[in-house]
Amino acid sequence: MGAQNTNCTMKFIDIPEDRQREAINTVALQTGLPPSSIEKDWWVTQVLKALHTLPYAEHIAFKGGTSLSKCWNLIARFSEDVDIALSREFLGFSGELSKTQISDRLRRAACSFVREKMQHDVRKALMDLGIRADAFSVDVVITPVTTTDPEVITITFHSLYEVSPYIKNTVKIEISGRSMMEPIEKKAINAAIDAHFSKAPFAEKPFEVNAVIPERTFLEKVFLLHEEFRKSEVRVERMSRHIYDLAMMMDSENKIADRAIHNEALYKAVLEHRRKFIGLKGFNYDELYPATLCIVPNDDIARLWQDDYKFMCEHMIFGQVPSFDELISKLSMLNEQIRQLNYRKA
């Protein structure tokens, strides 16, 4: 994959700015997204393309909410960040690992790789795609902590629009060496601009990425909710997206939710991976087995998340938008369905 030629003769950002705005506005009207989101989608797509032209592209996997929208078309939510799993075998860690190896050596190796090599590789890959060096910058905030995981590469791009606190002119790549790498599938993606103007001189053809299957993402979001609600201080900002994503996957035509929760091997694999590689302090991972799973927020948290969801609906979600009460109702139904499963720890 690393050797594929993904260049075209002209990049979208090379055409006159008035034509860029015109094209962006056309797609914005079609999708219901703000123009700045359409612009940012082009940059998110370029970042993904750059990542999948790296020499070690076979050792990365595209995961998280952005993969649900870009690869699987399961959610009508603009996802602005790119979550990447980096193979721990590629980093030199194979076989069974101790907690010390995970919490120190693996995290340190991933952090070092991102800071010392990957950020520079991404910058070169974007330029190799034909993007002018003055159109973007690449940065990693270097802190004294050398075990940061996930580590973040930030791409800041020149925007046609005034930067807002809701849709920033940055694409964040979150890279983790502790994530699961399997199961994945090859999926072809492209930017909304390219899909709409497929015959234009600047249009780029779809390209393949290594995408985590949505069933795994579904289970990871289920477990994340249970873990979150066990914390003394539950996060609020942009957290309601997880409930929305689960609800959309429950409604999907290809039965993502049913396939996820009834795949006992996958359920246990994701759970046990979180136990070993996430390992929240003081949390009993046996609680994630069906009999004790609790993914519905209490009334106090629900009120806070409802306000967060209102923000998400105004700025990040497009198309038909379910009410927050509908989301909670679906979540309660899902919780009951999972509770009826008889999976047990081996």
Functional labels for PLM-detected ranges:
Residues S69:
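Betabetaalpha-Me/HNH-type nuclease active-site subdomain
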Residues F62-T66:
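Glycine-rich beta-strand-to-loop/alpha-helix junction loops that act as flexible
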Residues M1-I60, W72-A76, R88-A346:
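Structured mid-to-C-terminal alpha-helical surface segments
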